[in-house]
């Protein structure tokens, strides 16, 4: 096998596919990248029996062939090469890389032992790539890190008509984002549970300014994503995800609206002097919200901001990290807190003006911390 390709093109493709290499592979060959050269193009792929990544790049192919190369070292080599065409050759078990005056020789890995790459399922529809990336950032903050509850370490994706919904929860907060789905078949409904790492990778590396194609599993356990020359597949997670939609209250008689940046900065400042996870108290009254943390001999801090309150005065407390996580992913100038009463979760949504309707495409439900009685 022999081909020549620009350094930047090769480095980008190798770097992207190498991101999917397993940390603890069940077999040494899974540390490798499968490189296939054919007429005018080169395919670079990784697979760990659960997640596959594949990118096709244009190249000047002099001799077709297939080889398996240690992935991480190849990625490091490609990043270090000078900005010039790279000549890549593979002969039996020896791989040679030449770029200007730089020469590398690596031992190849046995291609025969590498698992067969899964095919991308049939495309079911598309979403706007940038919108999907934003949605992933907004919901992944609520993904659980508790490996004893594996279902909650995933992100649920639901398809209904022309709407895609992403959901995640760690039992203390819940994030839900709806985006426009462009289906091939508008009658198809689906609900799948994906590894959060897979969804995060798709959001950060496949979702550019164009469309992201998604292949839902008509049968079996494989979902696929495609954008440009990149393809990735992943097996689904098993189990029944809890019906977390039911946790959103139907009616919320109390609403408070605060400027997002002001509240985020105040929460950050007050958290500086509060002990770890000391609750932030928010006391909403007509025209203002008083924020404070700490009591008695503890370090204390407080700040008062302008707020628009509809309904009765209310005092609540939240885990400062959970509140800050939510505020960071809102792209609106204002956030709205919707309450039933103080002991119940609040629904946080965004809006562009203090007296406007809220944008319910993204909602962040946050459990309160119980306040002391004295």
Q: Where are the language model's segments positioned?
A:
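Structural preference for solvent-exposed beta-strand-turn elements
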Residues: 1-374
């Amino acid at each position: 096998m022999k081909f020549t390709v620009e350094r930047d093109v090769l480095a980008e493709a190798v770097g992207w596919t190498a991101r999917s290499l397993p940390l603890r592979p069940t077999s040494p060959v899974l540390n490798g990248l499968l490189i296939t050269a054919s007429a005018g193009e080169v395919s670079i792929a990784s697979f760990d029996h659960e997640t596959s990544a594949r990118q096709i790049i244009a190249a000047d192919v002099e001799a077709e062939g297939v080889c398996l190369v240690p992935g991480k070292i190849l990625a490091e080599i490609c990043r270090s090469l000078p900005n010039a065409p790279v000549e890549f050759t593979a002969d039996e078990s020896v791989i040679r890389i030449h770029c200007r005056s730089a020469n590398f020789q690596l031992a190849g890995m046995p291609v025969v032992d590498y698992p067969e790459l899964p095919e991308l399922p049939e495309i079911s529809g598309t979403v706007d790539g940038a919108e999907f990336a934003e949605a992933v950032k907004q919901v992944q903050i609520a993904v659980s890190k508790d490996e004893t509850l594996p279902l909650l370490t995933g992100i649920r994706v639901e398809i209904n008509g022309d709407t895609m919904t992403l959901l995640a929860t760690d039992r203390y907060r819940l994030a839900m984002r709806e985006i426009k789905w462009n289906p091939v078949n508008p009658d198809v409904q689906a609900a799948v549970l994906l590894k959060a790492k897979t969804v995060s990778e798709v959001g950060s590396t496949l979702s550019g300014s164009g469309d992201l194609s998604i292949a839902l599993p008509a049968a079996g356990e494989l979902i696929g994503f495609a954008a440009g020359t990149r393809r990735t597949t992943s097996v689904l997670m098993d189990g029944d995800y809890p019906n977390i939609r039911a946790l959103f209250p139907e009616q919320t008689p109390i609403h408070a609206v605060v400027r997002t940046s002001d509240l985020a900065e105040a929460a950050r400042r007050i958290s500086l002097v509060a002990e770890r996870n000391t609750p932030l108290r928010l006391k909403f009254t007509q025209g203002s919200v008083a924020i404070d943390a700490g009591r008695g001999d503890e370090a204390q801090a407080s700040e008062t901001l302008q707020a628009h309150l509809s309904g009765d005065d209310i005092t609540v407390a939240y885990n400062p990290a959970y509140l800050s996580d939510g505020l960071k992913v809102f792209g609106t100038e204002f956030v709205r807190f919707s309450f039933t009463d103080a002991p119940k979760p609040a629904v946080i949504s965004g809006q562009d003006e203090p007296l406007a309707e809220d944008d319910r495409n993204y909602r962040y439900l946050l459990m309160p911390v119980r306040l002391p009685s004295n």
